[in-house]
Regions:
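N-terminal cap/lid subdomain of alpha/beta-hydrolase-fold enzymes
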Residues: 106, 117-120
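Flexible "cap/lid" subdomain of the alpha/beta-hydrolase fold that forms the substrate-access gate
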Residues: 2-66, 72-88, 115, 122-158, ...
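A short, Lys/Arg-enriched amphipathic alpha-helix followed by its capping loop at the start of a domain
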Residues: 103-112, 149
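Short, hydrophobic alpha-helix immediately C-terminal to the catalytic nucleophile
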Residues: 99-102, 168-172, 326
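Serine-hydrolase catalytic-loop signature spanning alpha/beta hydrolases and amidase-signature enzymes
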Residues: 84-85, 95-103, 114
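Recognition helices and adjacent regulatory flanks at domain boundaries
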Residues: 100, 119-122
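Active-site helix-initiating loop/hinge in glycosyltransferases
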Residues: 93, 320-321
């Protein structure tokens, strides 16, 4: 439990429910694993030998590879850009490493000092095996020390997936450290936890609470889970091979899985203040892991926010549609927009609302939830989804309250 009770442990009932589902889904998935092993044992245990890191993992063309030791833990990061510029801290997701931001580092470094971190347990950072070393309070304190060690008092945090969850928590726990938060393919932690039952990998999230077996399962069929998550990369792609190299040992999975073994048991205290700094939520319109409904609900925890949708992207919009993503990112972080009508940026929101309501109309089961959010944010003015003039409600998805 983090100090000041901003990040708290979930209720006893939630803990019991998670452990119960862990047993149920754990037994089910292990039975499936056993059946696959019996049917084709050679394919099940196939694991290509990978002793040499691909050049892209050690290449310095994207920036300098650096290390810092915090509380006895070594962190690896890649830094690019002038030290006189504002700092942008990039936090990757799962299963990934600093290389996740290969398309963003060159672009951002023209305007910022960029640090792409290997989270603890990932990449070339240390990989302690103990689950307790991945408690949220320890992770956040290490991120706090990292930012301070870089010689700044605050920075912009851009996080994807797990990195986004950590960014949300950092903005709540240490608001003085975060100038702006960009959460990519990642709803607010409270929304993430409450919407897990609708997630396509719900069973897997419960299964990974077990010890040892999830690590073994991740290695089967030559680290097939990497290909599953990184479907946007073709077979034998250089970057796909780099990810498989980074996750080719059992100990390479213990740390990453320990994040899930801890994050499912925490939430932001309901009496905490909403996040005061600007928040940009970016998601792909084809993401199967994160629902659009969850992104919209996450704005309840923000005073100032923008919601941006990357067309044609799934869970990795910063890689799959990196040009469109970079344009959104730079526009949010660098370019000054004209503000009209009491601080509401209408023009930037028009495309979002069109796609938002388009998504709602084609996905009926989420319509009521999005409508409830619209109703709430307009203080009851909007009671139903209109069939015409949808753009007149653009401001509710791009709020810059003073």
């Amino acid at each position: 439990m983090a100090k000041d009770l901003r990040i708290v442990t979930v209720s006893l009932w939630e803990i019991i429910k998670i452990h119960s589902l862990t047993f149920v889904f754990g037994v089910w998935i292990m039975c499936k694993m056993s059946a696959k092993w019996v049917w084709d044992p050679k394919s099940f245990f196939t694991l290509q030998q990978r002793d040499t890191p691909p050049a892209c993992l050690v290449d310095s063309s994207l920036g300098q590879h650096k290390y810092v030791k915090l509380k006895g833990v070594k962190f690896h990061y890649v830094e690019c850009g002038s030290r006189d510029l504002p700092l942008v801290l990039l936090l990757h997701g799962f299963p990934d490493c600093w290389l996740s931001w290969r398309h963003q580092i060159p672009v951002l470094s023209q305007h910022f000092r960029v640090v792409a971190l290997d989270l603890k347990g990932f990449g070339d950072s240390d990989k302690p095996s103990s689950r307790k070393t991945y408690r949220i309070d320890m992770i956040l304190e290490e991120l706090q020390q990292l930012i301070i060690s870089l010689g700044v008092s605050s920075c912009t945090v851009v996080g994807h997936d797990i990195g986004g969850l950590l960014g949300w928590c950092l903005a709540h726990q240490f608001p003085e450290l975060v100038d702006k938060l960009v959460a990519v393919s990642c709803p607010h932690p409270n929304v993430y936890r409450t919407s897990l039952h609708t997630s396509s990998n719900y069973r897997w999230l419960n299964f990974v609470q077990l010890p040892y077996f999830p690590e073994v399962d991740a290695l089967r069929e030559d680290v097939k889970i990497i290909s599953k998550y990184h479907k946007h990369l073709p077979p034998h792609d250089t970057y796909l091979e780099a990810y498989k190299y980074a996750f080719c040992r059992k100990e390479d999975w213990t740390g990453p899985l320990n994040y899930f073994r801890n994050l499912l048991f925490i939430e932001v205290a309901e009496n905490s203040r909403t996040i005061q700094v600007p928040v940009v939520l970016i998601t792909g319109d084809r993401d199967k892991f994160i629902k659009l409904e969850s992104i919209v609900k996450s704005t309840d925890y923000c005073e100032k926010f923008q919601v941006k949708i990357v067309d044609g992207a799934r869970h990795f919009p910063h890689q799959e549609r990196h040009q469109q993503f970079n344009e959104i990112l730079l526009k949010s972080l660098v370019k000054k927009k004209s503000v009209e009508d009491g601080g509401l940026e209408r023009s930037a929101s028009k495309g979002i609302v069109n796609r938002m309501f388009g998504a709602v109309s084609s996905t009926v089961k989420y319509g009521n939830s999005v409508l409830d959010t619209v109703h709430k944010k307009t203080n009851g003015v909007v009671g139903s989804i209109p069939t015409i003039n949808l753009l007149s409600y653009a401001n509710i998805y791009d709020r810059t309250d003073s």
